[in-house]
């Protein structure tokens, strides 16, 4: 069973975010749809100047979170818990979680980046924020930051997509799994919505997907991941929208815009090894 108290995993009490709903324009038609943004207000952990208190830019830096494929704000909730002193806005991409899908635009990396840009503009954050993204969200975040690097303080990419899943340099196993997944989402998109959702959200499929995606021997972490996927992995607008987003996640990568990321970038890999890069 998943730990009842997330402090078992983070060492910090859970933070409860407040939901905001912002209207963003469709990148094609301009028609507005709602995007959910979850705000975590900072919790002081130490008095300024005392041991353990954050210093310099870290003390004030607002964070913006962007989740991964088939995710929502819950996917980065433990990270928010572990960073209590930071104000955080966790954005649910159009079509995922509580956010509406685009009325007309395809759900691509560029269009999702457009939506995040519109949300950031509406929030009017007071300082250059740090953008933190996971998995598919890393391609969206990299695309956005590459357009205007000076707008951002830093970029943090958690388990970034370094190359397209079907690229020849990937392992044969990776390419086969990616091809199977692509077919799975394409088939679901062609079904009526009810059977498509039954296929996409089938418990055995979600369970196997979790095992394939998870690299840990920690039973608490594995149980928590299974529980989160069971609860939130089917929070998407439609099978068609999900197929579009999967296509975007499997054909794009952070490498597409790496040369334009002229700001400090932190990469965190599956092995939990962090490498700080100052690019440019």
Regions found by a protein language model. Give the residues of each.
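Conserved HGGG/HGGXW glycine-rich cap/lid loop of the alpha/beta-hydrolase fold
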Residues: 36-100
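Conserved acidic catalytic loop of the alpha/beta-hydrolase fold
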Residues: 110-128
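Gly/Ala-rich beta-loop-alpha elbow adjacent to hydrolase catalytic centers
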Residues: 132-137, 141
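Conserved alpha/beta-hydrolase catalytic His-Asp/Glu region
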Residues: 166, 193-260
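An N-terminal hydrophobic leader/cap segment in hydrolases
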Residues: 1-26
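Short beta-strand/loop motif that positions the catalytic acidic residue
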Residues: 261, 267-270
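Flexible "cap/lid" loop of the alpha/beta hydrolase fold
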Residues: 146, 152-194
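The conserved beta1-alpha1 loop
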Residues: 64-68, 134, 269-270
């Amino acid at each position: 069973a998943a730990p009842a108290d997330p402090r078992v995993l983070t060492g910090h009490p859970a933070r409860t975010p407040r939901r905001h709903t912002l209207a963003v324009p469709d990148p094609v038609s301009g028609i507005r749809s709602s995007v959910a943004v979850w705000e975590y207000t900072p919790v002081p952990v130490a008095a300024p100047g005392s041991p353990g208190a954050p210093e310099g830019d870290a003390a004030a830096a607002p964070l913006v979170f962007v989740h991964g494929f088939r995710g929502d704000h819950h996917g980065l909730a433990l990270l928010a818990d572990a960073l209590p002193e930071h104000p955080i806005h966790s954005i649910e991409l159009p079509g995922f979680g509580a956010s509406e899908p685009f009325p007309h635009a395809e759900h691509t990396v560029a269009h999702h980046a457009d939506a995040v840009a519109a949300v950031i503009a509406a929030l009017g954050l007071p300082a250059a924020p740090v953008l933190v993204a996971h998995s598919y969200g890393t391609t969206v975040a990299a695309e956005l930051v590459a357009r205007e690097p000076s707008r951002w303080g830093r970029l943090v990419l958690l388990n970034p997509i370094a190359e397209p899943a079907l690229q020849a340099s990937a392992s044969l196993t990776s390419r086969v799994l990616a091809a199977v997944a692509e077919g799975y989402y394409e088939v679901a998109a062609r079904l009526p919505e009810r059977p498509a959702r039954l296929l996409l959200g089938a418990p055995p499929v979600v369970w196997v997907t979790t095992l394939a995606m998870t690299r840990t021997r920690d039973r608490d972490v594995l149980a928590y991941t299974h529980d989160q996927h069971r609860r939130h992995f089917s929070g998407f607008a439609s099978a068609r929208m999900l197929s579009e987003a999967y296509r975007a996640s499997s054909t794009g990568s952070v490498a597409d815009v790496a040369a334009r990321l002229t700001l400090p970038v932190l990469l965190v890999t599956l092995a939990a090894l962090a490498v700080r890069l100052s690019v440019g």
